[in-house]
Amino acid sequence: MNETNDNDIDQLIYLFSKLPGLGIRSARRIALYLLQDKDVRLKSLINNLVEIDKKIVKCEICGNMDTENMCRICSSEYRDKSIIAIVETVAELWAMERSGNFKGLYHVLGHNLSAASRQNPSILRLPELLTRCFAENIKEVIIATNSTLEGQTTAYFITEYLKEHPAKISRLASGIPIGGELDYLDEGTVSAAINLRQPFE
């Protein structure tokens, strides 16, 4: 397959190459770095991954990742519990948190909708969202899906789904470029998009 002729090393390189942002060359460098000091580097990584796997759970309310069943955001008494931002994944939640400009709650969908693949809307956590909106007396829902075609499709579907709830529905400002994803934007851009959010039409 390659120069090493070692299936185990090939498998390690392959696994790293599947991580976001890593190609085969970067994966090969990481694998070599770990194997050159296997007893320290590789074992330390393995032990830490095992511990993380034991501790990290999905928040049963919003879908964030934390060490408790209710994440620190949902359990905080300092958050504005009348506003909820809908994000596609935890990556977008983290991006909004890095901006330091959003103090409300979140709802992680876990997916988006693609017209091309004809995904079933049931993959989204919308029944849970509607239940939260009524139970927590939500006043504003900020749709913070990405500015991709899939994100826009998802946003329109969410708006239709929430029609029976009286909350104001807004969308992040158009400063986010078309096709842009929150996770790749700097904190200033995300902060401005939150501040300048507009009613969803």
UniProtKB/Swiss-Prot annotation:
InterPro entries: DNA_Rcmb_RecR (IPR000093), Rcmb_RecR (IPR023627), Rcmb_RecR_Znf (IPR015967), TOPRIM_dom (IPR006171), TOPRIM_RecR (IPR034137). May play a role in DNA repair. It seems to be involved in an RecBC-independent recombinational process of DNA repair. It may act with RecF and RecO. Belongs to the RecR family. A zinc finger (C4-type) spans 59-74. PROSITE patterns: RECR, TOPRIM. Pfam families: RecR_C (PF21175), RecR_HhH (PF21176), RecR_ZnF (PF02132), Toprim_4 (PF13662). Residues 82-177 form the Toprim domain. This is Recombination protein RecR. Coiled coil: none annotated. One of its GO terms (biological process) is DNA recombination. PANTHER family: RECOMBINATION PROTEIN RECR. SMART domains: TOPRIM. GO terms for molecular function: DNA binding; zinc ion binding. Keywords: DNA damage, DNA recombination, DNA repair, Metal-binding, Zinc, Zinc-finger.
